[in-house]
UniProtKB/Swiss-Prot annotation:
One of its GO terms (cellular component) is cytoplasm. Its EC number is 2.3.1.30. PANTHER family: SERINE ACETYLTRANSFERASE (PTHR42811). One of its GO terms (biological process) is cysteine biosynthetic process from serine. It comes from the Bacteria. It is found in: Cytoplasm. Keywords: Acyltransferase, Amino-acid biosynthesis, Cysteine biosynthesis, Cytoplasm, Repeat, Transferase. One of its GO terms (molecular function) is serine O-acetyltransferase activity. Pfam families: Hexapep (PF00132). Signal peptide: none annotated. Pathway: Amino-acid biosynthesis; L-cysteine biosynthesis; L-cysteine from L-serine: step 1/2. Belongs to the transferase hexapeptide repeat family. This is Serine acetyltransferase.
């Protein structure tokens, strides 16, 4: 019981550290869906370890209904996990998450197919995964990594790295920029790039640089 209360205290403190909108302990305990999902998972995970699979899964599904956050009862979660906003977060069965991790809404820690066994990612300590990011497969995100919004990460990432894009690629490691770096405001828009290319092709057609071989 004391261990569980210590866990609650640590989780509440993590919210205050990560969310400037948090005002009081009562507000965090009563109003933050992310902490509700984590605390519910602690119970479901204990039942899962005792092979009470149906009851564990039932708790998980009820929690998803009320919070919008789906954590499989088999997932292993470290201390001070903060799920901010949380709607649409999915954490798979064989996922392992370290301490002091922050996850935003729409994040998926999932698999890449129907294989059995270890098929979900491992997340190290002090990792931040921004809104909408997908981390897929049996890969390792090492400690102190930042993953940008809407990134799709399919390969393991070394410590002290920043990853953005689809597919995810490292733009900063050990404090040094690698290649061309984009912040969230300047990430490339693939649709815009395709439209620009189409405009170039149309301009070439108008100028006679491209001959139309079709006869109508």
């Amino acid at each position: 019981m004391f261990k569980f209360l210590k866990r609650i205290k640590d989780d509440v403190n993590m919210v205050f550290e990560q969310d400037p909108a948090a005002r009081t302990t009562l507000e965090v305990i009563t109003s933050y869906a992310g902490v509700h999902a984590v605390w519910s998972h602690l119970i479901a995970h204990e039942l899962y370890k005792k092979k009470k699979y149906v009851l564990a899964r039932l708790i998980s599904q009820v929690t998803r209904f009320f919070t919008g956050i789906e954590i499989h009862p088999g997932a292993q979660i470290g201390r001070r996990l903060f799920i901010d906003h949380g709607m649409g977060v999915v954490i798979g069965e064989t996922c392992r998450i370290g301490d002091n991790v922050t996850i935003y809404q729409g994040v998926t820690l999932g698999g890449t197919g129907k294989e059995r066994g270890k098929r979900h990612p491992d997340i190290g300590d002090n990792v931040l995964i921004a809104a909408g990011a997908k981390v897929l497969g049996n890969i390792t995100i090492n400690a102190n990594v930042n993953i940008g919004a809407n990134s799709v990460v399919l390969n393991s990432v070394p410590s002290y790295s920043t990853v953005v894009g689809i597919p995810g690629h490292i733009v900063k490691q050990d404090g040094r920029r690698i290649g061309k770096t984009f912040d969230h405001r300047n990430l490339p828009d693939p649709i815009y790039e395709q439209l620009k290319e189409l405009e170039k092709q149309l301009e070439k057609t108008r100028n006679g640089e491209i001959q139309d071989d079709y006869i109508i």
